[in-house]
Amino acid sequence: MSSTLSLKQLIGELEILESEAAKEIASAENSESIEKLRLSFLGKKGKLSLLLGGMKNLSNEERPLIGQRANVLKTQLQELIKEKLEILKTQALSQILIKETIDVTAPPTGITQGHRHPLITTTEQIIDLFLGLGYQVSEGPEIENDYYNFEALNIPPDHPARDMQDTFYLGGEYLLRTHTSPVQIRCLESKKPPVRIVSPGRVYRRDAVDATHSPVFHQVEVLAIDEKLDFSHLRGTVMAFLKAFFGDLPIRFRASYFPFTEPSAEVDVQWRGKWLEVMGCGMVDPAVLEELGIDPEKYSGFAAGLGVERFCMVRHGLDDIRKLYTSDLRFLEQF
């Protein structure tokens, strides 16, 4: 830039600079280009600064005129840049909206819905059937003590179930319950007969994991205490429940042994051509009633228990209990 420009020439150069800047700002396509133009025209080493370097040869009266004109130009260019950035921002947003526009006439792709876990639905179905028979739901703690889990149920100290290899002991007298029967004892401590309860819950045993065993599984146990109850009431209740759950599968009772019931039986259903054990049951041992202060001469009762996993596997034709715990959506989406 010549250092001998007159006032008139400087004003002319400012007008040319204004026209050039306005044209280039208007044609800019993105914010990066705008920033380059800002530095080119308004930066410390930009065209406006270089042009104003010619003011040194002007008179004291002329310099304020050029300075004022340069400030007006700078403000105008800053406004043009600001307006252009807003335009570019609006255009970018419009492009995004166009790309994200939903075609309301397009057919739906469907929404993936969650499903209740088959163990939960099986438990609820079992409970609903017993609620229909007049039973009430009763629940208890999963951390139990020796008395409720063993002693009150007539399980002697030398019984195999108390062995460290079968029970998770937590220290002292506490353990993870091996069945939901302790719920029945707690209930009978607070309620007087007649009592009819169903007790669902998670239980724990030191079982190796395989196709039919798990160290954590679910049980539902049933207890009825009333006057003049006998084995025919037990058998009728179990038969009604199993037929309602499984349909017309053949059912049989086999004599068995449980410490807290006498007589005791195991219940099988015929499934895929074979007999499959699904329940244990029996008449409540009078010793258990006496321990709870219930007169066994006046009251009698029966108890029955089942594994929810076994019922779920039979209901859905599963051959491996581990499928119920893997959280594999490909498997769970079937239910």
Curated annotation (Swiss-Prot):
Protein keywords: Aminoacyl-tRNA synthetase, ATP-binding, Cytoplasm, Ligase, Magnesium, Metal-binding, Nucleotide-binding, Protein biosynthesis
Protein family membership: Belongs to the class-II aminoacyl-tRNA synthetase family. Phe-tRNA synthetase alpha subunit type 1 subfamily.
Pfam families linked to this entry: Phe_tRNA-synt_N (PF02912), tRNA-synt_2d (PF01409)
GO CC terms, sorted: cytoplasm
Subunit structure: Tetramer of two alpha and two beta subunits.
Reactions that this protein is recorded to catalyse: tRNA(Phe) + L-phenylalanine + ATP = L-phenylalanyl-tRNA(Phe) + AMP + diphosphate + H(+)
Organism, as annotated: Prochlorococcus marinus (strain NATL2A)
Name of the protein this chain belongs to: Phenylalanine--tRNA ligase alpha subunit
